[in-house]
Amino acid sequence: MVLSEIFRGNNEVREAARAGMQIDTVSVASASDAASAADGSGKITGAIRPSAVAGSFYPADRTALKQLINQQLDYGRKLLQQLEPTLPAGVPRAVIVPHAGYIYSGTAAALAYALLERGRGSVTRAVIVGPTHRVAVRGVACSTAAAFETPLGTVPVDIAAERKALGLSVNEPLRSGTHARPGAPAPAMIVNGPTHAQEHAVEVQIPFLQTVLGPDLTIVPLNAGDATPQEGGCGHFLGDNHAAIPWL
């Protein structure tokens, strides 16, 4: 099943998404497929979006953040061991997780991320689709940033994948106000830097993803407004290697 089929056929998932649940879609991509905002030297080329909620939604101190995440993941791993006989095999293609502060919902998120940890070494790109709390959008908005920064380090954005979804040329810059070209895979996608600047829903997922998927991670951060799954084009980012999608 593809993401759009699940949204069409699963009312519980649809209602959870409307209620503000964070949706994280993860695709398995090779290093060549998951082109990022890094140049040949591995350096980030472009603007880096700094952490907006470190120190409030999660610890700003790197050591304290790692300790908290590992504590929450350990709890999730223990629960998964008990559930192992009933779980599908393989790496999940998508998980639904909350986006509150870690002391409130981190343990619930950690259960999903402990399951996603199966993909460490094979999953190199995470597509993070979340709601907006500060700057509303119509459609699905990608960022103008080349990377997102957290206390655990800087994660490159897969700008090449965003350009493809928007129907842009290879070297066309991502400027706020840009809309998808006619016939683009994601017709409702736009570029909107301000909606990402202070938004926490996507950001709070990144430290967990850095921890469970490792240093080769790239991300596609998306803020979702009014758009159908088909218009948003999330399926475009999933690639050709499909697996079962458990929704948590």
Where are these regions (language model features)?
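Short linear sequence elements within intrinsically disordered, low-complexity coil regions
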Residues: E12, A16, S32-A35, R62-T63, ...
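Generic low-complexity, intrinsically disordered segments
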Residues: M1-A34
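Active-site histidine-anchored catalytic micro-motif
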Residues: G42-L248
